[in-house]
Amino acid sequence: GQGTALVGILDAFMDNKGLITAKEWKESCDDVVLLALLPKFCYSGNEALKGSIKVANYTPTTLKGKHLTWTLTNSQDQVIAQNNIPLQINQGTWAEVGPLNIALPAIQEAETYTLRLAIEGTDYHNHYPLWIYPEHNNVQIPTDINVIKKWDKQAENLLANGAKVLWFPDAKTYKNVTVEGLFQTDYWNYRMFKSICEWVKKPVSPGTLGLLMNPSHPVFAHFPTDFHTNWQWFTMIKNSHPLILDQLPDNYRPIVQVIDNVERNHKLGMIQEFNVGPGKLLICICLL
């Protein structure tokens, strides 16, 4: 047909691609599914986590005589809040079983919380990662870091003299060496949809496939992250213009790399660092 379609959880031999475990898959694909309806995934300390819990019951019988337990834990697996809800869900329906209104604690450092849902005595469960940030931004920019938005002779002189430079380029100035940010992975086949969009004179998707990074890098000391894209990156990705780094050595890896599609296969970077003479340069082409 149209070419390679990089979709699906199983490969052509019905083997797991390793994208997700069977246990995690069943959290959202089973005869009973527990759902937390939340307006967002990122919160500030002292904010209220509000939402509701719903249960879909597609077993052969009414779901009754059981309790659903929800638990909010921090990154040390300490319980922040917890509650039990009795269930009475008719067969073939989904229903709201209770509200969520949790007062989040004040925190000094960003942290990942987890909201877990489970029905006692069963294997039915689900979980949602949440990112909690200090209510007030206490980040102090070190005096030895020079923040610039425009590349000029002064920036070159700073690096030549051994300074540290943090550069936020204006993407409009570098349109020929950037692509636009895309949070979700590109769908199906980049070449096919690119040609269709061009034919009907519609914007072409950036065509990228998410982020790749090392969570232990010092730049993430106050920003919890996985090695891959997750919801705390949404706003930054939508306001990013990853740089095309094809001219750099094969073994160079940006701090935050953007994975390109197999058709185009650029090396793309959203955050990258370089030694420039005796100086150090950190380039961030997204709005932090």
Name what the model sees in each region.
Residues 86-90, 123-139:
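Short beta-strand elements
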Residues 1, 166-169, 283-284:
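A structural signal for short, well-ordered beta-strand segments and their strand-loop junctions
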Residues 143-191, 278:
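Short alpha-beta junction capping motif
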Residues 47-88, 95-101, 110-120:
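Beta-strand-rich binding/interaction modules
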Residues 194-288:
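Catalytic beta-strand/loop cores that center a nucleophilic Ser/Cys/Thr
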Residues 39-41, 84-90, 103-105:
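Beta-strand-rich interaction surfaces with strong enrichment in secreted/lumenal proteins
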Residues 1-47:
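Extended substrate-binding grooves/exosites of carbohydrate-active enzymes
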Residues 81-83, 126, 256, 270-271:
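A structural microfeature
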